[in-house]
Amino acid sequence: MKKEAYEVEYYEPKSVLAMQADRREEKHWRKQKKGIRAGRILLGVAILLFWEVSACLGWIDDYYWSSPSLIAQTAIVQWKEKNLAYDIYFTSMSTIGGFLAGTLGGAVLGLSFWWSKTFAKIFEPYLVMFNAIPKLALAPILIVLFGIGFSSKVMLAFLMTVISCALATVSGVENVDESMETLLYSLGAARWQVFGKVVVPAVLPWMLGSLRINISLALAGAIVGEFIASGHGLGRMVIYAGTILDTTLVWVGVIVLSLLAMVMYFAVVELEKWMTEHLAIYRKA
């Protein structure tokens, strides 16, 4: 009777010196991260101080450049009157609505290129053509079709993001492992099972990679729509302030827009990390 041989893998535990080295490296990395954060804060404070001092000493014309203190006072007044809060809400909802609709629509459109090769061959030239169209040029048409309210801003943000996500998804579809598809088909898997187990996990990283760009494009689309015609929003605030030559209010809108863009960007980064972790768990399942 033959004895079956089994291979046993042994994992050599880390030495004490190696563990200490890892801890030192981790500690160094934490200190470096704290230093980077502190550097960012100090740089921002230094810019604001230089700006304020320059305005007070007359180095710059505060009629055009205003000053941080005047901008803060104007922002507080606008916030108390609830104008600024609602404008932030309006722009945020327009951006998020267009971003979600564009990402979902682009993902469905891109994945359909795998599901139907005939559809892909028919639609691909139109996808390329529409990608070449400057979407912001469509803003006046969207204003006429959907009015100056919320819908036109969402539609413009949607158009800014849907093609970007679709192209990223198509790139992922083109890089799906065909040998894995063939293997599952040979084992009797249905088409929807191959789609769920092979295609979607392979395409998701490409889709996630487009999210950071899409949130910026969606915000740009919403703002341009507000520039052209809108009753609310940060873009409307900036245009209105410009028409009455209130440069301080213009700076309030610009700074709040910058902060809003930063918050949205980092929120998408955290969403991307969370989805990447769950994608890894899904692949192991």
Report each predicted region and the residues it spans.
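Membrane-topology segments of multi-pass transport proteins
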Residues: 1-35, 77
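Transmembrane-helix boundary motif in ABC transporter permease subunits
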Residues: 97-127
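Periplasmic/extracellular loop-to-transmembrane helix junction in inner-membrane transport proteins
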Residues: 25-33, 57-100
